Amino acid sequence: MEVYIPIIYWKSCSEKEKREILFRPVVNDNSQIKEVVKEIITNVKNSGDKALYDYTKTFDKIRLESIQVSYGEIVDSDSFVNEEIQKSISVAKNNIKIFHEKQTHNVVNIEIQPGVFCRQIIRPIQSVGLYIPGGCAPLVSTVLMLAIPAKIVGCKNIILCSPPPITKEILYASKICGIHNIFQVGGAQAIAAMAFGTKTIPKVNKIFGPGNVYVTEAKLQINALLNDLSIDMLAGPSEILIIADFKANACIIASDFLSQMEHGIYSQAILVTPSYDLACNVIFEINIQLKNLSRKKVINKSLKYSRIIVTKTLLECFEISNLYAPEHLIIQCENSNRLLVYVINAGSIFLGRWSAVASGDYVTGTNHVLPTYGSAIVNSGLTVMDFQKIISVQKLDQQGLIDVSSSIISLSEVERMDAHTNSIKQRLIALQDVK
């Protein structure tokens, strides 16, 4: 059966229609999911490992002998991973490491005025938990994207959770990243275990990694419950927006369109172009390429959320993209570098004909953990800074204190903070004794 995607003329749409066109599919607006997750969190908090064994038996249909993967199994994992995959993992690891090592924050250390010194020091988050989803295929690349930045900044305790049975590829990727505390537990129960800690799984300070609606809901609830724990971001369905000019390659655009939609039934792909002919050619190519794909059933379901929009000008394409704030933005146009100036909101950008999203998903070195659901308006993709915290430091010498004291006293009196005022006056008195 041929796929039909209607071509939308942006100029002809009302403001209401435009909002509806760029609307994301609603995935987890479900009170039942919220209640199920709440119960799981409570049970794991109260019953610890027992709850994890029970949930693994119920949800994964596996009776575990041990929650923790043995060191020997991790070390021996390379015996079960073929040489080609090992080589590919090594290429990806090296590129990710190179890019993320360059993200180290500039140290601020300045004398604001004579005698007043300010600086920032950067410290790693001590304990982090990495969640790697299970499902139909091992997400080896996600292990690399999370583990490498954590190791670069020096997080002291790094643990990894993934639903059983954990594949040898995931164990191997963890091993070469130096991760040896691996636990075969998944879903909302894994998030709860890392948040509260159990006899086997240590409590962490921050949880990273994508997952299904139950994992996402668990991260949301846990983040609201605990002050000493945070999360990286709430991952929604994968999405792509492609801006293409008259000379763009329809075959390549169709392949990018389809590659995004195979992630899941709620994935969304949008093409925005001033060329009606290109739009028609892309639809034609989608039908040709779809026939040969193994996940065409998933793609056919996600097609209902996909859009092809024809604009009057190329600049209008960028206006639409900034409204949508895509996770992945492809600019398949001439002089794509020069067009970067028009991009305000995007998770990750792929410039030119040869830059497939798949390259960033795996090996270019940039991180593929990106803001979705429009959160690229205010959020960034994962960097080493997500595994660190910045602490401000200040030091005043005697003259520095004297010079700023009147301003501090004046401002603290305006705010009626007389104890603040007193803390300065006591130091001024102590200065008299020093002299």
Curated annotation (Swiss-Prot):
Substrate binds at residues 238, 260, 263, 328, 361, 415, 420. Its EC number is 1.1.1.23. It comes from the Bacteria. Zn(2+) binds at residues 260, 263, 361, 420. One of its GO terms (cellular component) is cytosol. The active site is at residues 327-328. It catalyses: L-histidinol + 2 NAD(+) + H2O = L-histidine + 2 NADH + 3 H(+). Pathway: Amino-acid biosynthesis; L-histidine biosynthesis; L-histidine from 5-phospho-alpha-D-ribose 1-diphosphate: step 9/9. One of its GO terms (biological process) is L-histidine biosynthetic process. NAD(+) binds at residues 131, 189, 212. The keyword Oxidoreductase applies. Keywords: Amino-acid biosynthesis, Histidine biosynthesis, Metal-binding, NAD, Oxidoreductase, Zinc. Its cofactor is Zn(2+). Coiled coil: none annotated. PROSITE patterns: HISOL_DEHYDROGENASE. Binds 1 zinc ion per subunit. GO terms for molecular function: histidinol dehydrogenase activity; NAD binding; zinc ion binding. PANTHER family: HISTIDINE BIOSYNTHESIS TRIFUNCTIONAL PROTEIN, HISTIDINOL DEHYDROGENASE HDH. Belongs to the histidinol dehydrogenase family. Homodimer. This is Histidinol dehydrogenase.
